[in-house]
Amino acid sequence: MKLWGGRFEKSTDALVEDFHSSISFDQRLYKQDIQGSIAHARMLGEIGVLTSAEAQQIIEGLKGILTDIREGKIQFEIGAEDIHMNVEKLLTERVGTVGKKVHTGRSRNDQVALDLRLFLREEIDHTQELLIALLRTVLDLAKEHQETYMPGYTHLQKAQPISFAHHMMAYAQMFLRDLGRLKDTRQRLNVSPLGSGALAGTTFPLEREMVAQELGFDGITWNSLDGVSDRDFALEFLSAASILMMHLSRLCEELVLWSTGEFQFVIMDDGYSTGSSIMPQKKNPDVAELVRGKTGRVYGDLVALLTVMKGLPLAYNKDMQEDKEQVFDAVDTIQKSLLVVEPMLRTMKVNKKAMAEGAKGGFTNATDLADYLAKKNVPFREAHEIVGKLVLYCSKRGCGLEDLTLKEFQEHSDVFAEDLFESIGIEYCVRQRHIPGGPSPESVAQAILWTEHILEQFTGG
C-alpha cells in the first residue's frame, strides 16, 4: 500500500512504478532527508503536536536508520518511490504507528527542497576547499616564477613578453571569482523552505525558525509557493560550476598545448599522463584533456535543468524530479576535476629555457619599440607604422628587431638612438610594465599579496 494510496482503487502499473521512481538516484540525499526529519520531529515535540516521548521515539528510530544506511544494511525499494517514502516506511516498520506522525505539517515538496539545499550547502563547502587548494598551488607557481619569461598570446599568436607568474596569476583571479560565486550561491540557498507544505503552508503552528536554526540555516523562505517551486539555487550552483569548469578547461587546454613538442613549455608528470597502445613514444596529457571534455558535461547539466524549469507553472510539478541528477553529476564532475588538476599542476615541470626562447621570437618586443618612439614624442600611430615596417624588414631577412644595427633603425626613423636596444630586451620589456596588474615582478608580487589577502577572508585566517 502506498503511503498516499487512500484515494486510489487500484495499484500503480508496474511500468509506471519503475518510470516514476527516483530512489535509484535520490537515495544520495538520505543523510539530509533524515537530518531534516529529525529537526522536524523535534520541533513537533516542542510545539505539542507530538508528545515528548513520541518525538524521541521518532528521532531515535531515524538515527538508527541513518546508521544502518551508512553501514550498508538497508535495501531501498523501488515501490516506495523515493528517499522520503523509503525512510518513512522504514521508520514506521521500526517504531510502529507513531512513525506515521513524522510527516505532520509537511509535504514531500518542502521536504525535497530542504534536502537539496542541505546537500548543496555541504557540497559547495567541499568544492570551495578543493578550489582553495588549487588556488594556493597556482599562487605557489606564481611566487616561484616571477622572473620566468614567456610569450603572451593573442589569437594564439605571440604578442608581448610576460612572465609565467603573470600568466598563472590570471588564473588565480579567475579562481578567486569562482570562489566568490560559490560563496554567494551558498548564502542565497541557505534558507529553510520547510513549513511551506505542498504549496500553501500548513494549519499547524510550526516553529519554522526553530528548525532552520537547528539545521544551520540563516533564515526561512518567505513565500510558500516560492519555497517549493523554484530551483534557482540549484541553477545558480550549476552556473557557477559551469564557469569554474570553463576556467579549468582553458587552463588544461594551455597545458595540453604547452606540453607538445612544438611548445615544450611544460613537462607533465608521468602520474598524470598516459601512453598509447600502438605508439611506444607517446606521453599523452589525458588528464588535462578529460577535464576539458568534462566541461561540456557540466554545461549540459545547467542547460538540462534550465530547460526543465522554463515552462513550469507554480508550484511543484513532477518535472522537478529531474533536478537532482544534474546537480549530482555536476558536483561529482567539478570535485573530481579539482582533485586531479591541483596535483597535476603541482607536479609538472616548467621549462624556463623553452619559455624564454619563445619570448624572444615572434617580435614580442615590437610594441615596446613603438612605445620607445612615442615616448620621444612621435605620435603613436606613426610609431606603429614605423615599427610595422621594421618588422616586415626583419621578416624578409629572417632576423629579429634586436639583430638590426642602429644604422638600419635610423634608416626608418632618425629618432632612434643607441638607448633603443635596452628598451627591446625581453627582460626590460617585462620589468617596465610595472603598472598595477601588469607583468613586472613588482606588480606580480603585489597581485600575489592582494590575492592572498582576499583568500584569507574566505578561509578566516
UniProtKB/Swiss-Prot annotation:
InterPro entries from the UniProt entry: Arg_succ_lyase_C, Argininosuccinate_lyase, Fumarase/histidase_N, Fumarate_lyase_CS, Fumarate_lyase_fam, Fumarate_lyase_N, L-Aspartase-like
The entry's keywords: Amino-acid biosynthesis, Arginine biosynthesis, Cytoplasm, Lyase
Gene3D superfamilies: Fumarase/aspartase (C-terminal domain), Fumarase/aspartase (Central domain), Fumarase/aspartase (N-terminal domain)
Subcellular localization: Cytoplasm
Pfam family, one: ASL_C2
Reactions catalysed, as given in the entry: 2-(N(omega)-L-arginino)succinate = fumarate + L-arginine
Gene Ontology CC annotations of this record: cytosol
Main location: cytoplasm
Enzyme class, UniProt record, top EC level: lyase
One Gene Ontology term of the molecular function aspect: argininosuccinate lyase activity
Pathway(s) served: Amino-acid biosynthesis; L-arginine biosynthesis; L-arginine from L-ornithine and carbamoyl phosphate: step 3/3
Listed EC numbers: 4.3.2.1
SUPFAM superfamilies, per the entry: L-aspartase-like
GO biological process entries: arginine biosynthetic process via ornithine; L-arginine biosynthetic process
Similarity remark: Belongs to the lyase 1 family. Argininosuccinate lyase subfamily.
Protein name stated in the entry: Argininosuccinate lyase
